[in-house]
Amino acid sequence: MKGIILLLIFVVGLARLEAHAFLERADPGVGSTIQTSPSEVRIRFTENIEPAVSSIQVFDASGKEVDKRDLHLDRSDHALLHVSLPQLGAGIYKVVWRVVSVDTHVTSGNFTFRVLR
């Protein structure tokens, strides 16, 4: 029995070491429609992030980058990244992210959100 418990602890530990940072939640939400322009995009990941080698970009429908290029890590939550936005007009916006977790694994993805006015 003791051997099985030690094996489980070892396997769980290895799984944690091999963890990747995946999108856990975003604000604005993935595929969401919101009434007015958000002031920023916030993405929380499943693992802590290395902000110096990570990115979040926001593009309008024409492909122009519209974020303020001021990506920063949340002071109290090192799995949460923010990027500021100017006042956005009505339309569909694409968020493209690429992050490196503290264990050096790279993940990336994208999603859209829609602003009504």
Predicted regions and their residues:
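Bacterial N-terminal signal peptides
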Residues: 4-13
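Proline/serine/threonine-rich low-complexity linkers at boundaries of modular beta-sandwich domains
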Residues: 13-25
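Well-ordered beta-strand positions in beta-sheet-rich domains
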Residues: 25, 70, 82, 108-112
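Surface-exposed loops/turns
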Residues: 30, 36-37, 89-90
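Extended, polar beta-sheet/loop recognition surfaces of beta-rich domains
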Residues: 34-36, 40-47, 104-117
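Short, surface-exposed alpha-helix to beta-strand junction/turn motifs within ectodomains of secreted
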Residues: 41, 47-69
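Aromatic sugar-binding surface patches on proteins
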Residues: 76-82
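A glycine-anchored, Pro-Gly-centered beta-turn/N-cap motif
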Residues: 84, 89-98
